[in-house]
């Protein structure tokens, strides 16, 4: 069974968000998602300054098995991307909730957080797959 940290919020499409001290949110994919995808070989990230919309694809994770779109769990401006993934996409596999993060977004609509799942709700999504 996958690790699902309780302090994070989740999208049913397997992205997670973590609130940072500056009010931004770090986004990545869950341990469950990286297990399904397998070994990462390439990650395409949004650009800093891009505006992303909740539910729209904004990045791509490519593994030995498949390429998968990554969806923005929150609308806002991308304020940082994890440049380490360019040379080390395997960080997504080894540390999905830490060094394998994808990007940070400064949200424009905090009400969208209400659409995200807590750990228990996300576990139910996985169980239903």
From Swiss-Prot:
What range does the record give for the signal peptide?
none
Domain Lipoyl-binding residues, every copy: 24-106
**Swiss-Prot/TrEMBL GO biological process terms:** glycine decarboxylation via glycine cleavage system
**GO cellular component terms attached to this protein's record:** cytosol; glycine cleavage complex
Tell me where on the tree of life, at the top rank, the source sits: Bacteria
Pfam families in alphabetical order? GCV_H (PF01597)
Statement: the UniProt record of this protein carries the keyword Coiled coil: no
User: Entry cofactor note text?
Assistant: Binds 1 lipoyl cofactor covalently.
Q: Which cofactor does it need?
A: (R)-lipoate
Give the modified residues of type N6-lipoyllysine. 65
What does the UniProt keyword field contain? Lipoyl
What role is this protein assigned?
A: The glycine cleavage system catalyzes the degradation of glycine. The H protein shuttles the methylamine group of glycine from the P protein to the T protein.
What the entry lists under HAMAP family is as follows: GcvH
Summary of subunit composition and partner proteins = The glycine cleavage system is composed of four proteins: P, T, L and H.
Q: Which family does it belong to?
A: Belongs to the GcvH family.
Question: Protein name, please?
Answer: Glycine cleavage system H protein
Species, as recorded = Shewanella halifaxensis (strain HAW-EB4)
């Amino acid at each position: 069974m996958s690790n699902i940290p309780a302090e994070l919020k989740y999208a049913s499409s397997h992205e997670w968000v973590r609130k940072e001290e500056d009010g931004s949110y770090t986004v990545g994919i869950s341990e469950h998602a990286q297990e399904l995808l397998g070994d990462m070989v390439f990650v395409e990230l949004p650009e800093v300054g891009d505006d992303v919309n909740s539910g729209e694809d904004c990045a791509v994770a490519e593994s030995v098995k498949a390429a998968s779109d990554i969806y923005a769990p929150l609308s806002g401006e991308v304020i940082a991307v994890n440049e380490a993934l360019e040379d080390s996409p395997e960080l997504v596999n080894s540390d999905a909730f830490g060094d394998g993060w994808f990007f940070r977004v400064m949200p424009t609509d905090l009400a969208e957080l209400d659409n995200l799942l807590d750990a228990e709700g996300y576990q139910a999504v996985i169980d239903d797959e």
